[in-house]
Amino acid sequence: MGEVRFSYMKEKPILRGVDLDVPEGSMVAIVGPSGCGKTTMLKLIARFYDVDDGAVRIGGVDVRDMTTEDLFARVSFVFQDVYLFNDTLRNNVLMANPDASEEQLRAVADLAGVTEVVERLPGGWETLCGEGGRSLSGGERQRVSIARALLKQAPIVLLDEATSALDAENEKNVVRSIETLKRRSTLIVVAHKLETVRMADKIVVMDSSGKVAETGTHNELIALEGEYKDFWDKRNASSQWQLV
């Protein structure tokens, strides 16, 4: 991503000259305040939108020069607004790789925590998810989305971590899945959880104006005592809160 500028409305720029280099096989976490363009960056990589200026490249090729089929073969998406079709749970996972074996399906289900969902549902794998996946909770829908990414085995995975609090079981499964994805693919995560941020090889800190404020490892950014350290201290403090 080089000198990328983007706005949904011309009078309100979202990204202002963003540079982002993601080495193959690495994990990059993007953090920053709400509305700074973190999720927008993922959507530009996936070409949900085209940049206003600059370029997004994968392997040196501008995504605008890639066919939709080629781009989708290279990239998997795990976004917060997971959409499931009114089809069976099995087919909603298999859509990522229709030729996958039963063994492969069950392996990714175990990794993503979908097996627990299957066991809870009366119809198991053949349960209809309902339009938009309304038969499942938000955390369960994200598990299905992660299972899709694991089954697809795309070289690049874009993951927009849920901002809402997940129960302990969902949280554990998401972290475990991120660890697996990190071993298999180049992983770009919009991160909100401290544990996820610490897993990254590189952390990109966005400021409220849509610019990159800081870049580095966790230890490097803590030593800078800048925006990332403020972010870390506030999140760390809030994680210690208890109701009494």
Language-model features: locations:
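ABC-type nucleotide-binding domain
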Residues: 1-244
